Design a protein with these regions (language model features):
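Dynamic "connector" segments at or just before major functional cores
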Residues: 1-142, 148-167, 175-184, 410, ...
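Short amphipathic alpha-helical "interface-anchor" segments enriched in bulky aromatics
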Residues: 58, 288-323
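A short acidic (Asp/Glu
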Residues: 127-129, 200-207, 224-230
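Short, surface-exposed basic-aromatic patches at helix termini and helix-loop junctions that form
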Residues: 179-186, 203-213
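Acidic, metal-coordinating catalytic cores used for nucleic-acid/nucleotide bond scission
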Residues: 192-202, 220-223
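An anionic, glycine-rich sequence signature occurring as long contiguous blocks
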Residues: 210-305, 392, 396, 400, ...
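Charged, amphipathic alpha-helical linkers/stalks
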Residues: 306-367
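Extended alpha-helical coiled-coil "stalk/arm" regions
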Residues: 352-419, 423-436
Length: 566
């Protein structure tokens, strides 16, 4: 597979770079001699095969271990110091990139763009200390842990894995990781398939801006009906599922459609009108019938393969407990959200208080204007009445003067009526704004108290994930080596064996190893069941036909003893 060269070059380059920048330091356990390097790496690599979870388990280990290969089994302290020195030289990320390139070229030779399946594996970290926390689905609780970003290709081939803090989100990591992965692999990524965590609008906007293709599921898909979409094209049968059909669609709301760069693919059973599944993403030139088929490959190619690592390669085990202290990012985000709510309430309260002040000014202005107009009309009305009396005393015609008096009375009544109407309207508005201001004042006090109750001062622990990344690299390496052995050497009936099952049936099989000058002979104990005995005989024959040599050049021969011979 080419992993030997990749591991050696990456480790030695990291060691040289570390010693150049730290000339006073010494790496006693991380030797430049490759022959001394591999025994320690193999002890870490084959921990699941030996039935141990972490280096400290070798402290009480009583098995044969790798004694048949190296003549000895390392104990706890040597392996722990070796792993610690690998951590010091920061080999985790470079090793992950180098091995990813090897895996991609091994399983998918050539330069064709790759379709990858991605998902998080979240493992808990049991600690009593205040640490970054997130949701752990398998435990149904919020607790400290580590997120591992797992990448698989078609047929479930492992392409790589990276550790992230527990509060990481796919929206902020995936597009950048794809670009970096293309550089390290030297291959384009044709499409990325993920679960509903990647179906939101923020990630869709990032993918649209980057011009990349991805397929996900619309979150809350069952809240949408067919009337919410406008179909683009006609329904077509789903690939490998003649009982269902799919079609492309967009939002029926023009404003929503203009703001959302995502495309949608609706799927429904034949004979039904409403969609039962809504896929979203950027589909490039794929047909609507291919989208459900491709997304369904997540289960065998990604989900089940992660479970194989959990059961067969100690994926849930934590390595390394070094930490740094810093502000709790979750609490910081909670404080920022609470501060935003406080700011919204403050703006609303300020608006209502400004409205109250403005209405009071308008009431005062209205009162002053009304008083001035009322005095003027009263004065004119008094003068006109005097004029009517004067004319009556002089025996002159007073009809026109009386009409003017009646007109002034009507104007005065209209002025009073309009003033009272306007005053009542302004008082109602003032009461509404004052009531709302009182309510908002109480809400502001509550929200301010909730914001201030969020502890942003206490520092929390964030675990250093470098050692965990190194072990993740080795876990994926072990799984890929198992896949390679399964495809290259195992009998056809054993091609579907998981790593856990193969460890129980094959890798831990007792036997006898004899070292000769020109060859190494391994004789395994016979199997109890005839079908397993025949499968192992076929496996040994295929392995021996490949003429595999040990590291020192000796020919390696494996056979299984017949029942009663061993």
């Amino acid at each position: 597979m080419g992993v030997v060269k990749a591991v050696e070059e990456t480790v030695l380059e990291a060691q040289e770079a570390y010693l150049e920048s730290n000339p006073s330091q010494h790496l006693h356990h991380l030797a430049t001699d490759v022959a001394a390097l591999w025994p320690k790496i193999d002890h870490l690599l084959y921990q699941p095969i030996l039935g141990v979870e972490r280096p400290r388990c070798f402290y009480y280990y009583q098995g044969d271990g790798l004694e048949a290969i190296y003549g000895f089994t390392y104990k706890y302290l040597t392996l722990e110091q070796f792993l610690g020195q690998l951590t010091r030289v920061q080999v985790g990320a470079p090793l992950a990139e180098a091995l990813s390139a090897v895996y991609a070229q091994t399983w998918y030779p050539g330069d064709e763009p790759l379709t990858i399946f991605v998902d998080w594996h979240t493992k808990p970290h049991w600690t009593k200390f205040y640490s970054h926390s997130g949701h752990i689905a398998m435990w149904g609780r919020t607790m400290p842990g580590t997120k591992q970003f797992m990448l698989n290709g078609f047929d479930g081939r492992y392409l790589g894995g990276w550790n992230y803090p527990i509060d990481a989100h796919m929206t902020h990591t995936l597009v950048g990781l794809e670009a970096a992965l293309e550089c390290s692999l030297g291959r384009l990524i044709a499409c990325t398939v993920m679960d509903s965590e990647g179906g939101g609008l923020p990630l869709g906007e990032r993918y649209a801006a980057a011009g990349r293709c991805y397929i996900s599921v619309l979150p809350g898909e069952h809240t949408h009906c067919l009337a919410d979409f406008v179909l683009e094209g006609s329904w077509e049968v789903v690939k490998d599922d003649p009982g269902r059909e799919a079609v492309f669609a967009r939002w029926a709301d023009p404003r929503h459609a203009a703001e959302d760069p995502r495309r949608f693919a609706l799927m429904r059973p034949l004979g039904r009108s409403e969609p039962t599944r809504i896929y979203t993403g950027q589909f490039a030139d794929r047909s609507a019938g291919e989208i459900p088929w491709l997304h369904r490959q997540r289960w065998p190619c990604n989900e089940l393969r992660i479970r194989d690592l959990i059961h067969g390669a100690n994926l849930n085990v934590n390595y390394g407990y070094a930490y740094t202290e810093g502000p709790n990012r979750t609490r910081q985000r909670e404080w920022e959200a609470a501060q935003e709510r406080v700011a919204v309430t403050e703006r609303q309260l300020a608006d209502h208080r400004a409205a109250v002040h403005h209405l009071r000014q308008r009431l005062a202005s209205l009162q002053d204007a009304y008083a001035a107009q009322h005095r003027d009309l009263e004065r004119r009305l008094v003068q006109q009445r005097l004029e009517v009396r004067r004319r009556q005393c002089l025996g002159q015609a007073a009809t026109r003067a009386q009409q003017q008096v009646d007109g002034l009375r009507r104007q005065l009544d209209t002025l009073v009526r309009r003033f009272r109407q306007r005053q009542r309207c302004l008082l109602r508005q003032l009461h509404g704004h004052a009531t709302r201001s009182h309510q908002l004042s109480g809400r502001l006090l509550q929200r301010t108290a909730l914001r201030d109750a969020i502890d942003t001062q206490t520092l929390c622990r964030e675990r250093d994930l470098e050692k965990d990344q190194i072990m993740l690299d080795l876990q994926l390496l072990l799984a890929n080596l198992h896949d390679w052995a399964t495809e290259s050497y195992f009998a056809p009936t054993w091609h579907t064996l998981s790593l856990e099952k193969a460890t129980q049936m094959i890798y831990r099989k007792a036997g006898r190893v004899t070292w000769y000058r020109d060859r190494v002979e391994v004789v395994l104990e016979p199997y109890r069941y005839d079908d397993q005995q025949r499968a192992m005989e076929v496996t040994c024959a295929r392995f021996n036909a490949a003429n595999v040599h040990w590291r020192d050049g000796r020919l390696l021969r494996i056979s299984v003893a017949s029942p009663g011979e061993f």
